[in-house]
């Protein structure tokens, strides 16, 4: 970290012309044309690369330096906007400092009243409060009115009139913004050996609340006295910017060699099938389409503006559904729970009222739903009707309420992979009855699943011999080493042999989640034609259309493509038709009829 004093007037003289050009050519073209009081984030890393080194250093030298630079940039931006005929205000946030300025949490006490940047994981978060950010003042002498915008949590409430110099009186609060308190823990294992540095308190003002996850925080270390006469201070980080880190940036380490190998194997046309066999070995599930669908769900657990892919597996008792779900739960960002043994508060746990510097308010701590970044695997889904019903809002609204009054909610943006046995004698499917009537789940929940797959345990000599052989090999192998052909395979890519095992699969999934393929006009036409044809002869709804779109994007993402093509759509259609023919086929009418999902009153 920089710990130097800079003459701000010299910094202004050195950079004024250069900064005006940057604002005019780079900043203003990217502003929203309608928003007033827009928050504009300026990357200090970018400014440093453009030659504003001393300007960046001066923001780090002291809290005064930070606010002087920020206010100066706001002033220059306002001037340039007025020259172009726009009369609006923007709130500048200086963030994204270069990596060399990043510190560990144990170093925070050494940077009081300075800007810091650090990574951490949220272990506790308050429900959002509101903080007044714009006050209205009136001068008792001359009667003039002034609006004052407070951009930080600590300020001097003495406001003076610009005309008569008299002290102005507070009249009203004009505007509010969300306020949250976060307790953040160091990502490194060594953090457990330290006290106050281990769990710093972060005060954050922003539109979007945070409850769980790995975050990168840029903020100012402030000292708050425990009482008016106390010489003991609490250290608070006043957050300037909070950036949520994706799974790929926090839970797994991808080397350059890993990325090269991932891109190489992605060129194979059968890469999805290969990875699906590693994710769920055919010994656990012999349905190749089901294995492929579950793999695709891991790669695209949540798609912005489209939604998530939810899957229900209904397995006979001979299928080890728990082993399948636990295996998938080991992928970074995923979680596994058995809903039959779960308590309601474990889904999302609120604290009792907790006292702190600000007073008493509820905080969220614990809960498997908010901290799941990918797919939540739920076993025995039809064994706890109360919790299953409570989860319906997580399926539909992407939130989960944590109290009876539904006042407090936590995010639930993960996808769901649920599994259960059929509610029949001996947990075996009755061939004389429809699948939908044997699941034992109400239509309220069933309609939230994009795909429902029955998995039967049918005796097969070759498969049973393979299962027995694998079990014997595991017993013989005392060192618990991986078995080639079962636990890993070697694939040929341009004459090079690359090992694909579960560790490689996890890295592939994490990397592919960063890909955002686009949908072309040809793809839209193909999906529309399929939907029109299905509506002519069968009964499906827009939900199935949306599922095909999500699956098509997920297939393209699994192949690391920039655009979705017709082959991806074909694979998506094959997957959804596999589900529709097995679960919602009406033999009396001879058609696919999804209305069967809504008739189930179990």
Swiss-Prot record:
SMART domains: MCM. GO terms for molecular function: ATP binding; single-stranded DNA binding. The keyword Transcription applies. Keywords: ATP-binding, Cell cycle, DNA replication, DNA-binding, Nucleotide-binding, Plasmid, Transcription, Transcription regulation. It comes from the Archaea. PANTHER family: DNA REPLICATION LICENSING FACTOR MCM FAMILY MEMBER (PTHR11630), DNA REPLICATION LICENSING FACTOR MCM4 (PTHR11630:SF66). Belongs to the MCM family. This is Uncharacterized MCM-type protein MJECL13. It comes from Methanocaldococcus jannaschii (strain ATCC 43067 / DSM 2661 / JAL-1 / JCM 10045 / NBRC 100440) (Methanococcus jannaschii).
């Amino acid at each position: 970290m920089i710990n130097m004093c800079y003459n701000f007037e010299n910094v202004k003289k050195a950079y004024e012309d250069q900064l005006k050009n940057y604002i005019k050519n780079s900043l203003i073209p990217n502003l929203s044309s309608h928003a007033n009081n827009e928050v504009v984030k300026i990357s200090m890393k970018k400014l440093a690369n453009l030659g504003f080194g001393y300007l960046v250093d001066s923001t780090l030298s002291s809290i005064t330096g930070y606010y002087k630079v920020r206010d100066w940039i706001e002033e220059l931006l306002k001037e340039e906007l007025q020259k172009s005929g726009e009369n609006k205000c923007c709130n500048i946030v200086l963030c994204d400092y270069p990596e060399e300025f990043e510190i560990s949490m144990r170093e925070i006490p050494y940077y009081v009243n300075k800007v810091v940047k650090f990574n951490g994981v949220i272990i506790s978060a308050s429900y959002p409060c509101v903080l007044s950010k714009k006050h209205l003042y009136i001068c008792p002498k001359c009667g003039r009115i002034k609006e004052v915008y407070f951009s930080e949590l600590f300020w001097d409430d003495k406001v003076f009139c610009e005309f008569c110099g008299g002290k102005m009186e507070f009249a009203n609060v004009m505007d509010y913004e969300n306020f949250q308190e976060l307790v953040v823990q160091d990502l490194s294992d060594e953090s457990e050996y330290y006290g106050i540095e281990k769990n710093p308190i972060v005060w954050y003002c922003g539109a979007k609340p945070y409850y769980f996850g790995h975050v990168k925080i840029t903020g100012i270390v402030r000292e708050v006295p425990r009482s008016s006469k106390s010489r003991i201070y609490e250290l608070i980080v006043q957050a300037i910017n909070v950036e949520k880190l994706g799974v790929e940036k926090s839970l797994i380490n991808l080397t350059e060699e890993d990325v090269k190998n991932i891109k190489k194997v992605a060129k194979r046309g059968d890469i999805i099938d290969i990875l699906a066999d590693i994710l769920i070995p055919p010994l656990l599930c012999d349905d190749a389409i089901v294995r492929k669908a579950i793999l695709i769900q891991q790669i695209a657990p949540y798609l912005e503006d489209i939604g998530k892919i939810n899957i229900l597996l209904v397995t006979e008792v001979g299928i080890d559904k728990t082993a399948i779900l636990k295996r998938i739960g080991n992928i970074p960002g995923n979680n596994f729970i058995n809903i039959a043994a779960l308590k309601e508060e474990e889904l999302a746990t609120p604290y009792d009222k907790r006292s702190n510097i600000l007073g008493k308010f509820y905080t969220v701590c614990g809960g498997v739903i908010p901290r799941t970044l990918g797919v939540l695997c739920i076993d025995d889904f039809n064994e706890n009707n109360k919790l299953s019903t409570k989860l319906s809002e997580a399926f539909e609204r992407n939130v989960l309420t944590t109290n009876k009054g539904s006042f407090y909610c936590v995010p639930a943006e993960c996808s769901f992979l649920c599994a259960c046995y059929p509610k029949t004698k001996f947990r075996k499917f009755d061939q004389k009855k429809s699948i939908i009537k044997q699941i034992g789940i109400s239509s309220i929940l069933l309609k939230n699943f994009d795909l429902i797959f029955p998995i039967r345990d049918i005796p097969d000599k070759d498969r049973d011999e393979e299962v027995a052989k694998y079990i014997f090999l595991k017993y013989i192998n005392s060192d618990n080493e991986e078995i080639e052909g079962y636990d890993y395979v070697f694939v040929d890519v341009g004459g090079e042999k690359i090992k694909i095992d579960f560790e490689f699969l996890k890295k592939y999934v994490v990397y592919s989640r960063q890909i955002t393929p686009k949908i072309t006009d040809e793809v839209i036409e193909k999906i529309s034609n399929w939907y029109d044809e299905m509506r002519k002869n069968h009964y499906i709804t827009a939900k199935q259309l949306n599922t095909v779109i999500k699956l098509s994007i997920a297939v393209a993402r699994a192949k690391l493509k920039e655009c979705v093509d017709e082959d991806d759509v074909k694979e998506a259609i094959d997957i959804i038709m596999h589900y529709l023919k097995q679960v919602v086929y009406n033999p009396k009418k001879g058609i696919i009829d999804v209305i069967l999902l809504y008739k189930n009153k179990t």
